[in-house]
Amino acid sequence: MTVTAEKTDKSASSETSGRVVRVTGPVVDVEFPRGSVPELFNALHAKIDFGSLAKTLTLEVAQHLGDSLVRTISLQPTDGLVRGTEVTDTGRPISVPVGESVKGHVFNALGDCLDEPGYGEDFEHWSIHRKPPAFEDLEPRTEMLETGLKVVDLLTPYVRGGKIALFGGAGVGKTVLIQEMINRIARNFGGTSVFAGVGERTREGNDLWVELQEANVLKDTALVFGQMDEPPGTRMRVALSALTMAEWFRDEAGQDVLLFIDNIFRFTQAGSEVSTLLGRMPSAVGYQPTLADEMGELQERITSTRGRSITSMQAVYVPADDYTDPAPATTFAHLDATTELSRAVFSKGIFPAVDPLASSSTILDPGVVGDEHYRVAQEVIRILQRYKDLQDIIAILGIDELSEEDKQLVNRARRIERFLSQNMMAAEQFTGQPGSTVPVKETIEAFDRLCKGEFDHVPEQAFFLIGGLDDLAKKAESLGAKL
């Protein structure tokens, strides 16, 4: 099989040396001899011997300034780097270890193993800058990926081999839902998972490491972290490093891969910081002028090829809950399914706090999910939309001013809202309640009966934070009602 991008042979690099002429934070200007200027994206090494700060920095060539000068971005703190320091051109881009042996370990954006220093140095390495698969090798998929979460499976079904995003502002549950998907899908998936921690909290990375060990799926997972305390160069490249590992499993091992990215907004934010440091003219809302290109270069590599797939789940922070912000808006164009987490739903105590009217999926179509699934989903959406339209009237005049038909619809909508909530495995340690999984067929049947009015006599409380019909029957009985 032909791989569409270069593999890195460490022994084949040609090294030339230059010297540092300017250091401004993470931006380092380096002068090379004439005729020996390194190519864009080449990795450079600068050795710092400054007492306790002895280390080797990795710089990436970002611009050619002319007169044998290159402008680079450091992927590590530049403390101790001074003018005149010797810099070596490795002759190749940043590369990361690939292969079956990366599973069960944590790496940084440079491919250094964090849990076992030195591990992986003798593995095959691939450049993180690779071309997407050729058009003729692509294989679009329409197979549904079952999660066991009612609100997702019914209203925004996920595509196996597709790109899925969880949108939301600060504190509405994006990371919890990503961890929930790891728990639900990785356990039952049987393939390989790769997790990219892009600019998020170190604590969350440690929590995930512990959770994966407890769930016994760490042995099938590779983790790559570039946390929020690291330089923007690292945060900008860590997603590419994780994706490169995932591509090896897809292209060389012929496996279906799950790729989790938390958070794709931090990738965009790091690109904006780098763009500013390089002196580029800012675009809309201060973002980099190359935003669409950078997002496209990442997203186009996340795709399905013949017989193999990368299924990507990406958390996307929405600044100030503004969906017109260029960062989330640019991401929308590349997605197969979107799950939007709403502060209004969160305030009602409904978890996961998914806004069913704002979320969408390209496979919610009778030709893919079936006529019954599509019909029930559309009826649920119709009822919830009508309830939303009536809320202003209810707030001003009260529910008693509605027609009998609308009163009945409002009561069903309130039950539907609560029935879309569900206990999650990732939150068990906080709630004390075990997570529940509901098969798609049972979800469709339950909501069909609910829309037809078969549960109108059951109290609203019975629908809150439960699983399927068995849970509903037990809770209804405890409240003095029967299904």
UniProtKB/Swiss-Prot annotation:
SUPFAM superfamilies: C-terminal domain of alpha and beta subunits of F1 ATP synthase, N-terminal domain of alpha and beta subunits of F1 ATP synthase, P-loop containing nucleoside triphosphate hydrolases. Belongs to the ATPase alpha/beta chains family. Keywords: ATP synthesis, ATP-binding, Cell membrane, CF(1), Hydrogen ion transport, Ion transport, Membrane, Nucleotide-binding, Translocase, Transport. HAMAP family: ATP_synth_beta_bact. F-type ATPases have 2 components, CF(1) - the catalytic core - and CF(0) - the membrane proton channel. CF(1) has five subunits: alpha(3), beta(3), gamma(1), delta(1), epsilon(1). CF(0) has three main subunits: a(1), b(2) and c(9-12). The alpha and beta chains form an alternating ring which encloses part of the gamma chain. CF(1) is attached to CF(0) by a central stalk formed by the gamma and epsilon chains, while a peripheral stalk is formed by the delta and b chains. This is ATP synthase subunit beta. It is found in: Cell membrane. InterPro entries: AAA+_ATPase, ATP-synt_VA_C, ATP_synth_F1_bsu, ATPase_a/bsu_AS, ATPase_alpha/beta_chains, ATPase_F1/V1/A1_a/bsu_N, ATPase_F1/V1/A1_a/bsu_N_sf, ATPase_F1/V1/A1_a/bsu_nucl-bd. GO terms for molecular function: ATP binding; ATP hydrolysis activity; proton-transporting ATP synthase activity, rotational mechanism. Its main location: membrane. Its EC number is 7.1.2.2. It catalyses: ATP + H2O + 4 H(+)(in) = ADP + phosphate + 5 H(+)(out). Produces ATP from ADP in the presence of a proton gradient across the membrane. The catalytic sites are hosted primarily by the beta subunits. One of its GO terms (cellular component) is proton-transporting ATP synthase complex. Pfam families: ATP-synt_ab (PF00006), ATP-synt_ab_N (PF02874), ATP-synt_VA_C (PF22919). It is a peripheral membrane protein. Coiled coil: none annotated. ATP binds at residues 168-175. Gene3D superfamilies: 2.40.10.170, Bovine Mitochondrial F1-atpase, Atp Synthase Beta Chain, Chain D, domain 3, P-loop containing nucleotide triphosphate hydrolases. It is an enzyme of class 7 (translocase). It comes from the Bacteria.
